[in-house]
Swiss-Prot record:
GO terms for biological process: axonemal dynein complex assembly; axoneme assembly; cilium movement; determination of digestive tract left/right asymmetry; determination of left/right symmetry; determination of liver left/right asymmetry; determination of pancreatic left/right asymmetry; epithelial cilium movement involved in determination of left/right asymmetry. This is Coiled-coil domain-containing protein 40. Residues 1-78, 126-153, 173-196, 211-246, 261-289 are annotated as: Disordered. Residues 27-45, 267-279 have a biased composition (Acidic residues). GO terms for cellular component: axoneme; cilium; cytoplasm; extracellular region; motile cilium. It is found in: Cytoplasm; Cell projection, Cilium. The gene is Ccdc40. Specifically expressed in the embryonic node and midline.
């Protein structure tokens, strides 16, 4: 019978022609068997396993006594046959579901099932009839009575055994055992004790169909939870979850226990249904008044759970739910805020327990009166056994068919899931390819636009080059024409002497022109000074500076051309005057030299001023860049130090958490071994002292303490696992940050090496060119000496060949001047391009900053979405598990209802007593469906609370992320005003949080008061319901019974619809999860592409800045070189230091400055050793410069 009792906790699906849960059994199968066996058959008691079933975890087997067939097993009444006939399939289904669990968890669960089956089958049933079979009909099965038989004449032995059975029923029927909110796993050991005592009692050969004596015991414990459940209820049920994971049927066992604990009246009320014979009907009609009172009390309890009462409780809980804003927080039972509520609930439960004890005493008196009637029930046992065997065979066949259909359905669902996954993957790849194509198209369009711009710029440059070439050709033709004319004038010198007087007049005219030109020069000087002041005032406006610069350069070009034409005319006049008067030529030469010196000085002044402004701008830019790089370096160094500290902290925390985890695991294993030992010892002691109620209560308390400690250890272990996961996540994040910093450091090292190479190359080039300049300067000095010597030999007059040499040299100087002019034009163009490049660089820097911010935001969103996805997966697993449980329960209910309809035709022939029994079973099934609905609502509320707590935690995480981001922005920001505004915003946020905290404290106090009022309200509702039930004592007719049956069928259909809706929502959540994963991958690809573009842009910016610096240095060197060469050619080069003393002073000043730079570099190396290799080469060059001996 153990298999039947174990399966009764879950197995409620029965086969064709089987008995339903509503108690509608055929007349021949309504006698409960407790201890009697049919002739020539062996009996299975509690603790033994039938060979026909597959239950192996109990570890017990029948040695020499076996059942000849499954159909000859011991039957009971309507619930007991269900338990026996459903043994094989339900145990097989349990074996399928628990294939991944270990034997220990299955053994614990089966112990809980044994307790439930005993509490349902045996303790509540007191004697209606009592009959002892003859000695020939009883056989001993492993643990038989001493003689193996019991005769009718041994009346004293029967009375002693009945007294022991009464004491056992009082133990099992106590509220501590039959309370519906205690899971089977929490009562496993008690179950074994009770089963042991019951087997010892039943082996004596007693037949005890029992009258229900506890219809009033389970009202409060079995009362369905209210829609707005208090936190106390939720916390009481919380520890059952870990067991549900170890054993998938755990949730169902717990639910079944609460249901079957409250269905005890229905199991025994079906007993009179077998009384088709007149003698049995008379015994049913002679039921005492106690039975009628228990039936009325049971109906009152069922009516207290009517839909109207549930709606009233739902409206009361909805008000509290609206105030909390659908954010229920489950408090710990040891929390100080729960003390007041627990005291109120304790007082209420104590009153209920006192009331129940009084009811039990009254019912014990009633059972003693009805004990003499229970012997009559064993007469029809053999026929019932034969009928039960046939029904069991039919049930096994139907279970086999059901398992085959279920396997086929599961296989089809797996194929459908594979097809869906393949389709989703193909859609995702197609979307990715489309997005890549769109990105490539946009990139091609941008490149085409860039190419068009570059072609336009190239065309403009070519046009400028062509214009410059035309100007050069024109000047060359003019020079050739002037040379031809000069040769003609040399041939006609004699004719020019005659025209000397005319030339004197021309000289006077030229002197007047000279005066006018001097005034023009003064005007030009004023204009130059005004231009300088305008350049200083318009330094901020870069565009206007470039425009005025180009116009001033064009004006200078025109003035230089006019000056060259005037100089050519003057030279011609001087040659004419030389032939007439040498003194006039000497004066003219001195005048011309002074004029040239004046003009050159003016040009040198202008160029020097422009160069000074350029140098100042470049130095300011270099200083700003240096400061920016210094700040960036400091920020990177601080970030690196922070990451290293965080990594060390993470390693320390990880090691600490691992040690704690190891210690808790060892403690858990020790506690588990200790618990097993205590279980075995308690089983042995309880088998020896089965009738001692005090010992059983003591062991109940010990078991509850051990179970509480076990649940606490499991919760602590789960918390430690979560901490370890969080620590590993932090470690991975810090490792990623360290890798990123290492990469940036390597890139910066590469850039420093590249800049060092450029500096060394430029220095070598400067040294080479200085050597060439010195050589050319020596050649120029040598030629000047030769020229002076030749002029002195000729007496101060120049001959024809010398004039030709001078012309050649003047041509060379003009060519150099044209080259300088071209270099100036190219320099202007480069300056314009530089301005454009700087604008583009600033725009790109702004875009890069924006992209970095977006990347950071996307990373945060990614982390949040991953956490949401993981949470949704967990919820889906939980919901799918509960949905499977509910589907199984609904399928079993449907089968029971089908059996109910089949048996209703036969029940119409029964009398008024059978109708009342059917009414009880109907109420039991209605209460079972209501409890299932309340269980579903309870699960939804738990899910809502978990979601709310998760949202709160996510909100806190977002707040901390926001604070961290604000701190980083405050550190990196330069503008103090923006930091002050953010600080004020943070203070306002802190103030709002404090106000919210005060509001939450008030709301918490209000909720505690509401909880206390809810306990009082519950008591008043129960009292009112009991009074109303006593007033409204009605006998339900047959039509009302059929109406209630139809209502139940309607509720079952609604439950089916609800399950369909749940499956639809699960599929929708899966689709949203797939969509989110695809979008996340797309955003990651977009982020990688944006990162690649930013890297390319940064490389281009670096190249452009290097090219800009190189061009600026080359332009400056070329300009200074051209100036010095022009002055050397014209013999107007002026040394910076006219004497050796000033030169030595300047050299000392430069050496002091170099020594200061050397000290600065050494201090920088000490402060920042990571840049020691970069600065070492510069310091060595400065040292070599300092070590070179000074020239004497």
């Amino acid at each position: 019978m153990m298999d039947a009792e174990k399966v009764s906790t879950d197995g409620e699906a029965i086969s064709e022609g089987e008995v339903g849960s509503n108690g509608e059994t055929p007349p021949e199968t309504e006698v409960e068997f407790i201890g009697e066996t049919a002739p020539d058959t062996d009996v299975e008691f509690i603790g033994e396993t039938s060979p026909g079933t597959d239950v192996e975890p109990t570890g017990e087997s029948i040695q020499e006594t076996e059942v000849e067939s499954i159909g000859e097993a011991t039957p009971g009444m309507d619930v007991e046959p269900i338990k026996k006939t459903m043994t094989e399939l339900n145990v097989e289904s349990i074996g399928e579901e628990t294939s991944e669990t270990d034997v220990d968890s299955i053994r614990k669960a089966l112990r809980g099932i044994d307790l439930e089956s005993i509490t349902v089958a045996y303790p509540p049933k007191k004697a209606k009839h009592r009959k002892v079979r003859p000695q020939a009909e009883v056989e001993s099965t492993g643990r038989a009575a001493p003689e193996g038989e019991l005769e009718v004449s041994d009346h004293e032995k029967v009375e002693a055994l009945l007294d022991e059975l009464d004491e056992l029923s009082e133990i099992v029927s106590s509220p501590e055992v039959s309370y519906s909110d205690i899971s089977p796993l929490e009562m496993g050991e008690d179950d074994t004790n009770v089963s042991a005592t019951s087997t010892d009692t039943f082996q004596q050969g007693i037949y005890e169909p029992i009258e229900p004596i506890e219809p009033t015991e389970p009202p409060e414990p079995a009362e369905p939870p209210k829609p707005a459940e208090t936190p106390e209820d939720s916390t009481v049920r919380a520890p059952a979850h870990p067991y549900q994971r170890d054993f998938p049927m755990g949730a169902r066992h717990r639910f079944r226990l609460s249901i079957m604990g409250s269905l005890t009246p229905s199991d025994t009320d079906d007993l009179p249904l077998e009384t088709d014979e007149p003698p049995q009907q008379e015994s049913v009609q002679s039921t005492p008044r106690a039975l009628e009172e228990t039936r009325i009390q049971f109906l009152d309890q069922v009516q207290s759970l009517s839909p109207e009462a549930l709606l009233d409780r739902a409206t009361e809980g909805s008000d509290e739910a609206e105030e909390e804003g659908s954010q229920l927080i489950v408090l710990d039972p040891d929390h100080p805020l729960m003390i007041r509520f627990q005291e109120a609930l304790k007082g209420y439960l104590n009153r209920q327990m006192d009331k129940l004890k009084l009811d039990v005493q009254e019912l014990d008196v009633a059972t003693k009166q009805t004990r003499s009637q229970r012997q009559e029930l064993g007469v029809n046992l053999y026929g019932v056994q034969q009928h039960l065997a046939r029904l069991q065979m039919q049930l096994e066949k139907s279970h086999d068919r059901h398992s085959l259909v279920a396997c086929e359905r599961r296989r089809k669902e797996e194929e459908l899931q594979c097809a869906r996954s393949v389709y989703n993957k193909t859609c995702q790849t197609a979307n990715e390819e489309r997005k890549k194509l769109a990105a490539l198209q946009t990139e091609v369009e941008s490149l085409a636009l860039h190419l068009f711009y570059m072609q336009n710029i190239e065309q403009d440059v070519r046009d400028d080059i062509q214009v410059m070439k035309q100007v050069v050709r024109k000047t060359e033709t003019e020079k050739m024409h002037a040379e031809v004319e000069k040769k003609k004038q040399d041939l006609f010198v004699d004719q020019l002497t005659e025209r000397s007087h005319q030339l004197e007049e021309n000289i006077a005219l030229f002197e007047a022109q000279y005066l006018s030109q001097a005034e023009d020069t003064r005007v030009l000087k004023k204009a130059v000074t005004e231009a300088i002041t305008e350049i200083d005032t318009i330094a901020v406006e870069k565009k206007r500076i470039l425009q005025q610069w180009t116009t001033s350069l064009v004006g200078m070009k025109h003035r230089n051309e006019a000056y060259k034409t005037v100089m050519d005319a003057l030279r011609e006049c001087q040659h004419q005057v030389k032939s007439t008067d040498s003194e006039i030529e000497v004066c003219k030469k001195s005048i011309m030299q002074e004029e040239e010196k004046n003009e050159k000085l003016a040009r040198l002044l202008n160029r020097a001023e422009t160069e000074a402004t350029l140098v100042q701008k470049m130095t300011a830019q270099c200083l700003s860049k240096q400061e920016a790089l210094q700040t960036e370096f400091n920020t990177y160094q601080l970030a690196l130090q922070d990451t290293e500290e965080m990594l060390n902290k993470g390693y320390v925390e990880h090691s600490a958490v691992l040690s704690e985890l190891q210690a808790t695991r060892q403690a858990f294993h020790q506690e588990q071994e200790l618990r097993q030992k205590m279980d075995m010892s308690m089983v042995d002691k309880l088998q020896e002292q089965g009738t001692s109620s005090k010992m059983t209560k003591y062991f109940h308390q010990l078991l509850r303490k051990l179970q509480k400690e076990n649940t606490n250890l499991v919760t602590h272990l789960s918390k430690i696992d979560g901490d370890i996961a969080q620590a590993t996540l932090d470690i991975t994040n810090t490792n990623c940050k360290i890798d990123m910093h290492k990469k940036t450091l390597a890139e910066m090292d590469k850039e420093v090496k590249r800049f060092n190479d450029l500096i060394t190359n430029s220095e070598s080039e400067i040294a080479r060119r200085t050597i060439l300049i010195e050589r050319k300067q020596s050649l120029i000095n040598f030629f000047n000496k030769q020229l002076e010597q030749m002029v002195s030999e000729l007496g101060g007059e120049e001959a024809g060949p010398l004039e030709l040499e001078i012309k050649r040299l003047s041509k060379l100087t003009e060519e150099y001047n044209t080259g300088v002019a071209e270099a100036q034009m190219t320099w202007l163009r480069l300056q314009q391009e530089l301005v454009q490049v700087t604008h583009e660089r600033e725009e790109q820097l702004v875009s890069v900053d924006q992209l970095k911010k977006e990347v950071h935001i996307m990373e945060q969103k990614k982390l949040r979405i991953e956490s949401k996805i993981a949470h949704e997966k967990k919820e889906q697993k939980i919901v799918s598990r509960h949905m499977r449980d509910l589907d199984n329960d609904l399928s079993k209910l449907n089968m029971l209802l089908d059996k109910n309809r089949c048996s209703s035709e036969e029940l119409e022939q029964n009398n008024i007593a059978t109708e009342t029994e059917f009414l009880r079973t109907l109420k039991d099934s209605e209460r079972e469906t209501i409890q299932m609905q309340e269980k579903l609502m309870e699960l939804s509320e738990e899910k809502a609370t978990l979601l709310n707590s998760f949202m709160e935690a996510e909100h806190q995480i977002m707040l901390w992320e926001k604070k961290i981001q604000l701190a980083k922005e405050m550190r990196s920001s330069v503008d103090s005003e923006t930091g002050q505004t953010e600080i004020r915003a943070m203070k306002a946020e802190i103030h709002r949080m404090k106000v919210r905290h005060g509001q939450l404290l008030k709301q918490q106090e209000k909720m505690i008061r509401d909880m206390e009022l809810a306990v009082a309200r519950r008591e008043t509702i129960v009292v009112q319901a009991e009074g109303q039930s006593k007033i409204d004592k009605k006998v339900i007719t047959k039509t009302e019974f059929h109406y209630q049956q139809r209502e139940l069928q309607k509720k079952v259909r609604e439950m089916h619809k609800a399950t369909d809706d749940c499956t639809n929502t699960i599929s929708e959540l899966e689709e949203t999860q797939k969509f989110l994963s695809s979008s996340l991958q797309e955003k990651q690809q977009l982020l990688s592409e944006m990162q690649a573009t930013t890297d390319v842009l940064e490389e281009e910016i670096n190249q452009l800045t290097a090219l800009k610096r190189q061009n600026l240095l080359e332009i400056v060197t070329l300009q200074t070189r051209g100036k010095h060469l022009q002055a050397a050619i014209e013999g107007k080069y002026v040394f910076l230091h006219r004497n050796s003393r000033s030169q030595l002073m300047e050299r000392k000043r430069l050496s002091v400055r170099l020594s200061q730079l050397n000290k600065v570099l050494s201090s920088v190396q000490e402060d920042y050793p990571q840049y020691q290799e970069v600065l070492q080469s510069i310091q060595q060059k400065i040292a070599t410069k300092l070590e070179t001996p000074e020239p004497s």
